[in-house]
């Protein structure tokens, strides 16, 4: 991450961090150590509590904003970029009272230009709710796809038989396992609770 911006660039440019949540936790201190007072670092991970806890005592905590855009597809990487991905989508912001209000105001202007709908939420509540409405559906999709592949030796035949309902249900199983494994680990307690109720 830091090799992408060197010297004075590290100090003057705001950064949006869109990497797996375990990588955010390992890199966030280093990033915050290299910024100026006028730089805002925005994390876009799918879990919030552990990341917010990681930076709570950092001297540049005021230069950090925890955000989670509720937008995306099952695909990842630069080739999966979509022009209007964030248009009219929800953006959850956590612990905004700990962010410098001038920097926050600038960020809100950017999000407004992106036509995003802002929801403010505590990081603990975010992780609890997102376990039900996002993480649980990904686990279900991964497990359905895995179950079918393990049980059906003739995969071509079973996929020929499968209708649009099956295709829709396993669509999320195409998502990056590396990205989602770290999300599941970071939010494991809430996910276990949601799974117990689901089963």
Task: Label each PLM-derived region with a short phrase.
Residues 1-7, 11-12:
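Single conserved hydrophobic/aromatic residue that forms the stacking wall/gate
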Residues 15-16, 42:
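N-terminal Rossmann-like NAD(P) cofactor-binding module of classical short-chain dehydrogenase/reductase
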Residues 16-27:
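Short, conserved structural micro-motifs that define repeat-unit consensus positions
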Residues 18-20, 45, 95:
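Glycine-rich, N-terminal phosphate-binding loop of Rossmann-like dinucleotide-binding domains
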Residues 27-79:
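Rossmann-like NAD(P)(H) cofactor-binding subdomain of soluble oxidoreductases
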Residues 65-99:
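Active-site capping/gating segments
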Residues 85-171:
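Internal alpha-helical scaffold of NAD(P)-dependent oxidoreductase catalytic cores
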Residues 155-199:
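Interdomain hinge/lid region at the active-site interface
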């Amino acid at each position: 991450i830091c090799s992408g911006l060197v010297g004075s660039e590290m100090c003057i440019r705001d950064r949006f961090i869109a990497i797996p949540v375990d990588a955010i936790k390992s890199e966030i201190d280093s990033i915050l150590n290299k910024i100026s007072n006028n730089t805002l670092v925005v994390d876009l991970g799918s879990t919030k509590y552990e990341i917010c806890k990681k930076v709570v005592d950092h001297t540049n905590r005021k230069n950090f904003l925890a955000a989670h855009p509720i937008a995306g597809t099952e695909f990842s990487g630069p080739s999966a970029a979509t022009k209007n991905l964030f248009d009219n989508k929800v953006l959850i912001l956590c612990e905004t009272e700990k962010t410098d209000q001038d920097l926050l105001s600038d960020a809100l202007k950017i999000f407004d230009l992106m036509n995003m709908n802002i929801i403010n939420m505590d990081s603990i509540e975010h992780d609890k709710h997102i376990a039900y409405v996002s993480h649980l559906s990904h686990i279900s999709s991964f497990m359905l796809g895995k179950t079918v592949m393990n049980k059906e030796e003739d995969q071509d035949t079973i996929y020929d038989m499968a209708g649009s309902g099956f295709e829709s249900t396993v669509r999320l199983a195409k998502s990056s396992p590396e990205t989602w494994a770290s999300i599941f680990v970071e939010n494991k307690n809430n996910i276990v609770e949601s799974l117990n109720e689901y089963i």
